[in-house]
C-alpha cells in the first residue's frame, strides 16, 4: 500500500510545489533582506521604506523540503514578470510622501526650475523705471504657465486699480500679457483640501510658501465676466496707457521720414568723382604720364586756366582756331597737340606753327629749297597755311615734354627747359634774338643753327660751304677728288663755327638732331607743304 501511495504523494507534492513555487521563491527573498535599500531617501521624508514585492501574499506557507528535481517542469515561464514582482513598485505621485520631488518640510530648493518661485518678485534692487514700463510685458507670472490649464479664478474687486492708481501700483499686481492662457497657479497651491490628485508643480514647492504670492496671481485682468464694466474699462485704460503710450514729443523729435538735404546737392557727390575725372588722352605717351609740373597733360582741367599768366609767354593759337571743326573730339585733340607744340623742345620742324614762328618756317623753306624758289617759299610763309593734323601728331621720343624736371637749363623768356646748354642757346637764337651767325660761303645765306647750314650746304654740288683751309699743307693732291681747295680766308673767327658744324655732322655728337635726321624730316615736311 505504501508502494501504491508513494506515487500519489509524489504527484501531490509535485502539483503543490508547482503551485507554490513562486511563493517559495518569494519567501526566500523576503527572509533575506538587502543590505541597503534600493531607493535611498532622506530621513526627513516621513515615509516608509519601499517594499520589494508589494504584490506578494501576506502569509506565506512554508514547505518542508524542496521538491524533487526530476518532477520540475522543463520550461519555466515567469508569468509574473509583467506585474513587476521582481522590481520595486513605482512610488505613487502623492503629496504626502514622494520620492520624486523635494520633501514638504525642506525649505531651500536645490535647483529652482521655475522662475516664478525663485523669490525675485519682491526684489528691491530692480529699478522702478524698468518696473513700470516692462512689468506688463515681461512678468514672472507669465513665464512658465501651462497654456490651457482649466483654472477658475475668483474676482477680487478690491484689487482692481482705478484711474488714480499709478503705474507702480499696477506693477505690484503683476498682470501678465493679454494672452488666452490663464494664471499659472492651480487650485492645489491655493487650497489645502485638494490632496486627491498630484500636481506636478506641487512637487517643487516648499510647504511654507510665501503668502504674498497667492493674492498676486488671482488676477482680474484676463477679461472675466464677473467684474463690472466700469472697472474693466478703467483697467483697460491704465493698461493701454502703460504699454502703448508713445509721447508725441518723441515722435516729433525723431523725423524718420524727413528728406535728407545733404545728398540733394550735386557738389557733394561730385567731389567724390573728381579724382577719377582726369582721363588721359589716347595719344598720350608714357613720358607725358610721368611728367610733373604745371604742364602736365593728364587731365582736361589743365586747359581751364589762363596760359599767359602761368607760362609767361603768349601761347600760339592752335590750328583748330583757324577753321571751325564740327567734331568735338577732333577739336579737343587738335587743341591738345597745339599746346604741346607750343611747349616742345624742338619747334623747328613744325610747319603748322603760329605767327611767332614764321621766321623759323622761312629758314626751313630756304634751306630745303634751291635759291630760285626763295620767293615762292617766303610767299607760303606769309600766307596762313591750312591746318595739317598729321605733322602735329608725329612726335618722336626725343621730342618729349618740356616740363621734365631732369632738364636743368631753363629759358628766361619762355620758361622752356633743356637738357643741354647748346640746346638752350640754339633755342634762344632761333626764337628770341633771331640771330643768324652761320652763313653760307657760296650764296651768302645766313642761318641761326649749324645743322640748318649743314643741310643747306648739301644743296651745293661743289661743297664750297665747308671751309677746309685749316690744314697748313695746301697741296691739292692731299684732298679727295671731289674736294677743291677753297680760297684763303682771312677771317679766322669762322674756324670755330666750322669745327662746330663738323662736330654736328658726327652721328654721336652732342647735338640732338644730326644733319641726316634734319634733312629727312625737312624733305618729308617740304613735300607735304607743297
Swiss-Prot record:
The keyword Nucleus applies. GO terms for cellular component: chromatin; nucleus. This is C2H2-type transcription factor MSN2. It holds the Pfam family zf-C2H2. Keywords: Cytoplasm, Metal-binding, Nucleus, Repeat, Transcription, Transcription regulation, Virulence, Zinc, Zinc-finger. Transcription factor that acts as a key downstream transcription factor in the HOG1-MAPK pathway. Plays crucial roles in the regulation of conidiation, virulence and multi-stress responses. In addition to regulating the expression of genes specifically involved in stress-response, conidiation and virulence, controls also expression of cellular signaling factors. It comes from the Eukaryota. Disruption phenotype: Shows remarkable defects in conidial yield (40% decrease) and virulence (25% decrease). Decreases tolerances to hyperosmolarity, oxidation, carbendazim, cell wall perturbing and high temperature at 34 degrees Celsius. Significantly reduces the resistance of conidia to oxidation, hyperosmolarity, wet-heat stress at 45 degrees Celsius and UV-B irradiation. Leads the repression of conidiation- and virulence-associated genes and affects also expression of stress-responsive effector genes and cellular signaling factors. Disulfide bonds: none annotated. InterPro entries: VerF-like, Znf_C2H2_sf, Znf_C2H2_type. GO terms for molecular function: DNA-binding transcription factor activity, RNA polymerase II-specific; RNA polymerase II cis-regulatory region sequence-specific DNA binding; zinc ion binding. A zinc finger (C2H2-type) spans 409-432, 438-460. It is found in: Nucleus; Cytoplasm.
